[in-house]
Regions:
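Glycine-rich nucleotide phosphate-binding loop and flanking beta-alpha elements
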Residues: 34, 57, 117
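PLP-dependent aminotransferase-class I/II
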Residues: 69-120
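Conserved PLP-anchoring active-site segment centered on the Schiff-base-forming lysine
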Residues: 41-59
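Conserved N-terminal alpha-helix of the aminotransferase class I/II PLP-enzyme fold
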Residues: 1-31, 53-58, 64
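Conserved core of the PLP fold type I
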Residues: 24-43, 73-80
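Glycine-rich loop at the start of a catalytic domain that most often binds anionic cofactors/ligands
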Residues: 17, 37-46, 64
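Short coil/turn connectors at secondary-structure junctions
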Residues: 20-23, 44-47, 69-70, 104-107
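Domain-start "cap" segments at the beginnings of catalytic or binding domains
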Residues: 40, 56, 62-64, 69-71
Length: 120
């Protein structure tokens, strides 16, 4: 796995679709591993990811995100989804906090689609 003609072809198709002929393309074995690697790569060491309280990274990945040193910052859910108004309120509260430099900074948002409830 990984060095066969099908994998090579898939890599080339992904590079072409992205317009990045020199890009490294890696295939991962599962969702938790993928979420962990992507989120860790996106975030600085002092940042966390905002997710609905029922989001997969918050409720079903057995601390995989926290294992990399990042915190999952949760907001309310509605049938598994977050509301833009709740996210905005969370971010405004963070930025208005006089001690924001001592708090985990929100650096990414995790959106479940479909949600843990099957909501689209």
């Amino acid at each position: 796995y990984g060095s066969d003609e099908y994998t090579a072809s898939a890599r080339e198709k992904i590079r072409a679709a992205c317009g990045c002929p020199e890009a490294d393309v890696w295939f991962l074995t599962g969702g938790t591993q993928t979420n962990q690697i992507v989120i860790d790569t996106l975030l600085a060491s002092y940042e966390g990811v905002v997710a609905a309280v029922t989001g997969h990274v918050a409720a079903h990945e057995a601390g995989a995100i926290e294992f990399t040193g990042h915190k999952v910052l949760t907001i309310p859910q509605y049938a598994g989804k977050m509301k833009a108004a709740d996210l905005k309120a969370y971010l405004v509260t963070y930025h208005e906090d006089e001690s924001a430099e001592h708090i985990v900074r929100p650096g990414a948002v995790y959106i479940s689609h479909p949600t843990e409830y099957g909501t689209l």
